[in-house]
Amino acid sequence: MLLLQFSNMVEPTGPAIVEDERTKALNSYRRKLAECRDIEQKLKDLRKKESEMTKQFDKSENDIKSLQSVGQIVGEVLKQLSEEKFIVKATNGPRYVVGCRRSINKEELKQGTRVSLDMTTLTIMRQLPREVDPLVYKMSHEDPGNISYSDVGGLAEQIRELREVVELPLINPELFKRVGITPPKGCLLFGPPGTGKTLLARAVASQLDCNFLKVVSSAIVDKYIGESARMIREMFNYARDHQPCIVFMDEIDAIGGRRFSEGTSADREIQRTLMELLNQLDGFDSLGKVKVIMATNRPDTLDPALLRPGRLDRKIEIGLPNEQSRLEILKIHSNKITKHGEIDFEAVVKLSDGFSAADLRNVCTEAGMFAIRAEREFVIDEDFMKAVRKVGDAKRLETKLDYKPV
């Protein structure tokens, strides 16, 4: 009994002590490793904060310098005399022979380039972008929207022809070089109102990663002589500077009408605008990445000089849709409508003879209005039948237009 108690009082030796020390060391290592990771994360956050504060400090310093610095004069380069000297015309009138900063690329300082001049030495400090008219700047910020070709129903042949004229030369110009032909400069979309001319142009611009200028032709006409022609020049200069670019001119009959000898001063101003447009169309580079799309519902009033090949190489007629096309368009417009039960679209299409795409969209809107009138949150087949009859009765008051090939 005494021997047993003595053995219990003896401390463990050998492997047990080694295992205990190993466990303690391992736990200590894990704690140190966790502390190291925390310190690394804190260091990373501090460095990120330091970088942000450095950027903010630099920005504040630049703002203070810009507030303390003297303004500069805007001028225009007239001629390069030597490698370092240029003749510059200031905005207030006089001309100066000035030097240039070393950091500026002198090859880009061509005639007509806008530059900023130092107030005291008149040295060229930096190159400025081309002056853009506010109206042209507004045109360039026109968003074509996220429209795909599947949103344009019943125009498969017209889409193919338009993509050959606009999309193919921008994506694969080498194909035209190998064949040995000059790519078309632009095309004319003509047809009755509401057939999808503007929608088709927006779909092309949305699918291409390029700049888009939407021009309403009636907005170009100005009461002051020469202003309309200047707007055309600035518009095409902006398009050339921001290639690839698509210029879409809607309602081109506002400035592209047939010229005649008699008329008022306003008519002569519109004719001068048309002549400037003809000049800009002829001035394009053969493989330039600027394409023109024009749209009108009055092709018979356009000037023959505008329609000749070399300016508008392809004329695409967008007529009223046939029965199959009307079915496709109706399904596209009714896709987002909350429907209940089965809708007989074929019966609706048979009652919509002579309808345009805009009329079919109006049918869907009227069907929704009938559902709202009946205090329902969904549209049934009867609503579509009522809507197509209502739109058909309204179309009888419209005058039918005859579109002959251009």
UniProtKB/Swiss-Prot annotation:
Xref: PROSITE patterns: AAA
Gene3D superfamilies assigned to the protein according to its UniProt record, in alphabetical order: 1.10.8.60, Nucleic acid-binding proteins, P-loop containing nucleotide triphosphate hydrolases
GO MF entry, a single one: identical protein binding
GO cellular component, one term: nucleus
SUPFAM superfamilies tied to this protein: P-loop containing nucleoside triphosphate hydrolases
Compartment(s) where it occurs, according to its Swiss-Prot or TrEMBL record: Cytoplasm; Nucleus
One Pfam family it belongs to: AAA
GO biological process entries: ERAD pathway; positive regulation of RNA polymerase II transcription preinitiation complex assembly; proteasome-mediated ubiquitin-dependent protein catabolic process; regulation of protein stability
UniProt xrefs under InterPro entries: 26S_Proteasome_ATPase, AAA+_ATPase, AAA_lid_3, ATPase_AAA_core, ATPase_AAA_CS, NA-bd_OB-fold, P-loop_NTPase, Prot_ATP_ID_OB_2nd
Residues binding ATP: 191-198
Sorted UniProt keywords: ATP-binding, Cytoplasm, Nucleotide-binding, Nucleus, Proteasome
PANTHER family xrefs: 26S PROTEASOME REGULATORY SUBUNIT (PTHR23073)
Family statement: Belongs to the AAA ATPase family.
Function: The 26S proteasome is involved in the ATP-dependent degradation of ubiquitinated proteins. The regulatory (or ATPase) complex confers ATP dependency and substrate specificity to the 26S complex.
Protein name (database record): Probable 26S proteasome regulatory subunit 10B
Organism: Caenorhabditis elegans
